[in-house]
Amino acid sequence: LNNVHFLCTEIDFMGTTERKAKEKEELKALILKAARKLFIEKGIGQTTIRNIADSIDYSVGTVYVYFRDKNEILHALHTQGFVDLGGQLKVLFSVKDPMERLKAMGKVYITYGLDNPEMYDLMFTLKAPMEFLETIQKDEWDEGKASFDLLRTTVIQCMDAGHFKGHKLDPLCFLIWSCIHGMCSLEIGSRTKNANIKNPENIVTDAYDEFLIIISNL
């Protein structure tokens, strides 16, 4: 009987531990959901620990149990963005022709950026996620590295197929990324509307088509 009682107690303890772990994960997800809503609707300035706590009816102290500061929350949100974008890019590896895949990756990247301008800024422009990495003394930007590796792998395969002869791998990858990022950033920042550009409503699409012509001839 003692053995049975001990076994039941152990099972109950394990069940309680698992339940508490699940509750913690659910509350952490709730905090991030509230933070993302605030960030997208009201901007980084209004995405404060206090406002996040108020929006989910929890104390500020509860939020601090899960996140050390605002920058950690913003870093977690930026990671969510990379999971979303990375998932869309990985699907394209079903495209066997690496050049066609490279072209499709650019379109997916641009579409994601223009459809999610606030998240795009957080992922690629705002300093908060990088400041968090500095705070915890982490040198590598894992999310950026993973995305860059998807691009690098595709460009390597393009080179193996005979494209980009005479070009250096990483500088070329960085050039491709920079050009597409620039298109997204200028459009998101409303820099294309009043710059005396013809057909500004289509300029990103038209510019990307021109970019594809250029890289196809490299």
Task: Indicate where each model-derived feature is located.
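Generic hydrophobic, amphipathic alpha-helix propensity
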Residues: 24-35, 52, 77-89, 151
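Hydrophobic alpha-helical connector segments
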Residues: 90-118, 172-176
